[in-house]
Amino acid sequence: GECCRDRRVSTIYIGGGTPSWLPEQYMELIQKQLRVSFDIDEAAEITVECNPGTLTGQKLMTYKACGVNRLSIGLQSTFDDELKLLGRVHTYEQFLRNYELARKAGFSNINIDLMSALPYQTTVKYLTSLKRVIALRPEHISAYSLIIEKGTPFYEKYRFDAVKREAGMRTECLPGEETEYEIYEKTKEVLEQNGYRQYEISNYAKAGYECRHNIGYWKRTDYLGMGLGAASLIDNVRYTNARDLFLYIEETSDIHAVSIEGVEHGMATNLHEQADVVSRNAQIEEYMFLGLRMNAGVTREDFAKCFSCS
């Protein structure tokens, strides 16, 4: 927390994998250490990503007791065959049980992730999932389209179809651009009819429940990443943490011994495998393409305020 000692933390997001896999006492320890190390706003948004297959009632009660006030639950689909195809460890029934437990634990700000453009998924099937989720009345819904990344098992399995889709050709199992566009438009229409306002390409929320943490990314506010390979943006220097587990543990074993001189001067320390100063032109480019992800867009006034120019 030394490099951010003069800053007040307004959001915390614990993700980057499956934090709900951790035994609850470790999440409690993490929350306590964050409060010792940082000046956290009393009204801070504190989110934990959750996999429905690794949640328990006890974990949820512990999260609530130690200050977590927002959950992001990776449901992805309400159909078990689609969940199996995605390699998820939960069933829809498990999700429903844990969603109810989250409400009983007192959580009043919950996001649910849904995924479209799955292999063999029809528009009707996807919309069925969407309507089932809406019926649960979460405060926030994230609706993403599946991106098949090269080098992943998913890509190896569907690479011929993925290549065809990239070339604009029809495929047997993956939806084409027209279908994806139809799903996107239908998603927006159905969600807005049910009181969810789109505020970013893939994100919809009831009034006042927009994800403040993600908005910070899109507005290029400074953020500090902790953990293997985590990224940070501090004073227009972008850092990437070491990806070597043993090196990371060694460098953070005595947190008071970690030098911040490199952070203050835009240089990589042993903890960072990379540190890049973001040029003014790159700052402007990022500000524009990230800002245009949001429905609010980019205003002349905000741009002038950020870059002292028009």
Per-segment meaning from a language model:
Residues G1-C309:
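C-terminal scaffold of the Radical SAM
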